[in-house]
């Protein structure tokens, strides 16, 4: 069983079409039997159409789990709950983002945004910093596909006191590398109080290969996925969240080049890691996250002098696993039973007040926000490989805010939370709009029956 990356072109469509439905149909027409998309992004859009990158699971008919879920399943929220202000912060993995494109370097942004939210829902790429994780206290650590499903309205999230975390690792040919991972689990037990549901070694291990797409984004390929899925399936009752640590094969010499690049090379590991965890969380409805294992102890102990600050967490870490264990420790439970969505302790799409993304990023979360009328704040300063004009998406007027930086984003978040029009605190201030309605002509049209009037069944019966 494979996880592969596919690039497809989808022609542009006329205005008024629901984009989620359009993309679902266009993608389905280009997939082979047994292929299921687990990850979707539009890397470039123009007058000719949309260049899309898909993470594809092959041989899905051999999966050990039951009914599969389409990543395009959508449920419109009927109301927005306004008793709390909850925001979602996303920095897509593997796109070379200025903030969040390396090792947890978007954590200060997450902590900043969390300061004006009741809850900040974010994902591993934002806060994972190898052996460091300083996510905000009111942050919810959620795998990327789970955020998509939350915004699509098909799942809810429930806070937990703690999770039983299963750790699945490669049975590494270098015994010391495996021992580092086991020690990391023990360290989490005695510092966090983590309930480790055990460490399972897989032999032969699942093969992960890091690659780059034509857009320059980090993607990859996974082989032997069925071995990992089988372990998770057989032990499903033993854990609440699953951490995976395994080698990621990269091009020869890239490891050294990456650390010496001054942050100019896109982190090669994240893309294939996201493909893997999207599959796990989608198939089993469990929180999941991945940490790369070193190729050998020489790599684990490699020294590169003073590196770019955004890469420094990797330079001071040898195991890269603690961030994952800390995140999964209290990652929220995934609720799929819609009968429970009205429970006061279940967070759903109705509870999301805003989505914050780098400018130009279009994937399921952005498209879902458009359909759910969730305000979106797009940050220009967080430059990345995506080439999309968000202004061309069918946002309801006043639901898209393009800002220069995350400091400005906090201002917009505060305005939304306070119920203050953003335009009211900007200058120049536009003139108040005044229009006229010719009521005599309107009433005449009613009298002549040119404008239909809704009549209740009771009133119709009286007539």
Predicted ranges, named:
Residues 205-377:
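Long alpha-helical, hydrophobic tracts
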Residues 2-258, 262, 266-270, 448-458:
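Metallocofactor- and cofactor-centric catalytic cores in central/energy metabolism, strongly enriched
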Residues 136-145, 305-323, 393-405:
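Acidic, Ser/Thr-rich peripheral helices and adjacent loops at domain boundaries
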Residues 133-135, 256, 301-304, 389-391:
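Short secondary-structure transition/capping segments
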Residues 126-134, 207-211, 283-290, 395-401, ...:
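Noncatalytic linker/hinge segments flanking ATPase motor cores
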Residues 295-299, 319-352, 358-463:
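C-terminal functional extensions of proteins
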Residues 108-112, 278, 415:
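Short, hydrophobic/amphipathic alpha-helical patches that form generic packing surfaces
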């Amino acid at each position: 069983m494979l996880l592969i990356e596919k690039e497809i072109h989808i022609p542009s469509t006329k205005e008024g079409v629901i984009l989620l439905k359009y993309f679902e149909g266009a993608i389905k027409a280009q997939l082979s039997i047994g292929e299921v998309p687990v990850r979707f992004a539009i890397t470039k859009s123009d007058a000719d159409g949309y260049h899309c990158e898909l993470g594809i699971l092959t041989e899905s008919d051999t999966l050990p789990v039951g009914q599969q879920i389409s990543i395009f399943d959508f449920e419109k929220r009927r109301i927005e709950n306004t008793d709390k202000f909850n925001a979602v912060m996303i920095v897509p993995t593997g796109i070379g983002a200025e903030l969040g494109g390396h090792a947890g370097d978007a954590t200060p942004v997450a902590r900043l945004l969390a300061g004006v939210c009741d809850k900040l829902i974010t994902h591993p790429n934002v806060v994972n910093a190898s052996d460091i994780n300083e996510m905000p206290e009111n942050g919810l650590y959620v795998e990327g596909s789970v955020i998509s499903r939350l915004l699509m309205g098909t799942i809810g999230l429930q806070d937990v006191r703690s999770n039983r975390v299963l750790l699945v690792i490669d049975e590494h040919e270098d015994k010391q590398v495996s021992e580092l991972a086991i020690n990391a689990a023990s360290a989490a037990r005695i510092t966090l109080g983590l309930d480790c549901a055990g460490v399972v070694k897989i032999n032969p291990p699942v093969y992960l290969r890091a690659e780059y797409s034509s857009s320059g984004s980090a993607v990859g390929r996974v082989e032997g996925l069925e071995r990992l899925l089988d372990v998770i399936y057989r032990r499903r009752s033993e854990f609440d969240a699953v951490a995976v640590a395994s080698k990621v094969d990269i091009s020869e010499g890239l490891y050294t080049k990456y650390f010496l690049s001054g942050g100019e090379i896109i982190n090669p590991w994240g893309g294939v890691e996201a493909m893997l965890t999207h599959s796990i969380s989608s198939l089993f409805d469990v929180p999941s996250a991945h940490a790369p294992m070193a190729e050998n102890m020489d790599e684990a102990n490699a020294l590169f002098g003073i590196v770019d600050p955004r890469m420094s967490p990797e330079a001071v870490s040898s195991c890269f696993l603690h961030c994952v264990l800390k995140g999964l420790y209290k990652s929220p439970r995934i609720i799929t039973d819609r009968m429970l969505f009205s429970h006061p302790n279940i967070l759903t799409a109705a509870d999301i007040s805003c989505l914050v993304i780098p400018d130009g990023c279009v994937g399921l979360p952005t498209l879902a926000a458009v359909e759910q009328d969730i305000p979106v704040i797009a940050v220009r300063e967080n430059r990345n490989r995506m080439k999309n004009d968000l202004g061309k998406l069918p946002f309801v007027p006043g639901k898209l805010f393009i800002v220069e930086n995350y400091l400005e984003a906090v201002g917009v978040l505060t305005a939304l939370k306070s119920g203050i029009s953003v335009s009211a605190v900007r200058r120049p201030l536009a003139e108040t709009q005044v229009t006229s309605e010719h009521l005599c002509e309107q009433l005449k049209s009613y009298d002549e029956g040119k404008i239909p009037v809704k009549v209740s069944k009771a009133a119709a019966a009286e007539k």
